[in-house]
Amino acid sequence: MIALINKILFSNGYERLDIEPSSSNEIFYAFYLPEGHQREEYFVTIQLQEQSDTAAQELLYEKAQILFEEISNSGKVDRPFEKNCTLLICHEEEKISRQTILALEEDHYNFKKNVITYTSNELESLESYIIENGIEKIT
């Protein structure tokens, strides 16, 4: 799912920041709009390699702040990052509780957070649709 979300961001003019995570359980990418755009908006996409409700709670209570600080202190983002960044969390639907999703999305600290849940069948169907219809850019 994270590859699909990243493709959407690339298709809409976002560029990837080169930042390495300090933790090995997450795959994450940071995106920004290059100079010349009228808004300063950042997105961070993340997918836990070992997905579980407990791992998602760790992201909420510990790792999101660490990730936020790593990106903020990287020297690769401007001051507006602190107020204009959305964390898109890709997580398999059956491996996260509704309560944890709400806790993540309602958390007011560091990032604005959105959880994108999916099933394996939904992801496979969407990927097949994109390939079968020759869709190269998703805007």
What residue ranges belong to the model's regions?
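Nucleic-acid nuclease catalytic cores
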Residues: 75-98
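"Short basic amphipathic alpha-helical interaction patches in structured regions
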Residues: 59-63, 98-107
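Switch/connector loops and helix/strand junctions flanking conserved nucleotide-binding motifs
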Residues: 54-55, 96-100, 124-127
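N-terminal "first-domain core" detector
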Residues: 1-73
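Conserved beta-strand segments of the P-loop GTPase G domain that flank and frequently precede/overlap
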Residues: 44-50, 86-93, 116-119
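Charged, structured surface patches that assemble and position nucleic-acid processing machinery
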Residues: 20, 103-139
